A protein has these predicted regions:
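Local sequence-structure signature of Cys/Sec-based thiol-disulfide redox active-site neighborhoods
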Residues: 2-39
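Glycine-/small-residue-rich active-site loops that bind phosphorylated ligands and cofactors
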Residues: 24, 48, 78-79
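Short alpha-helical
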Residues: 24, 51, 86
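Non-catalytic, surface beta->alpha helical segment in thiol-disulfide oxidoreductase systems
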Residues: 73-94
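Thioredoxin-like thiol-disulfide oxidoreductase module
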Residues: 45-66, 91-93
């Protein structure tokens, strides 16, 4: 799986973004995190190999996640969609 790391000063939380390369809300979510200097990783699911894509989609389905972006924080909280207030709260941002 091609996971991309975006370095940032804020490393208080483990953040993984599941995105689609063509999704404007996914792009905005990644920009939001980068602008706030959050260290995070992302994977563009539509660009993953067929095997990786199936595994990712199966994992997300088990979490009742059927849309993007999906932001997994600290391996326990999942935020689905472009929800800035939820991201700010979960990441303790202003």
């Amino acid at each position: 799986m091609n996971v991309v790391t975006v370095p940032g000063e804020m490393k208080d939380h483990k953040v993984l973004v599941y995105a689609l390369s063509t999704c404007v809300w996914c792009k905005r979510t990644k920009e939001f995190l980068k602008d706030r200097k959050v260290h995070y990783e992302y994977v563009d699911v539509d660009l993953a190999s067929p095997e990786d894509r199936k595994r990712i989609e199966d994992d997300l389905r088990r979490l009742n996640c059927y849309s993007y972006p999906a932001v997994l924080i600290d391996d326990r909280r999942l935020i689905v969609g472009f929800k800035l207030n939820d991201l700010k709260e979960a990441l303790e941002l202003r």
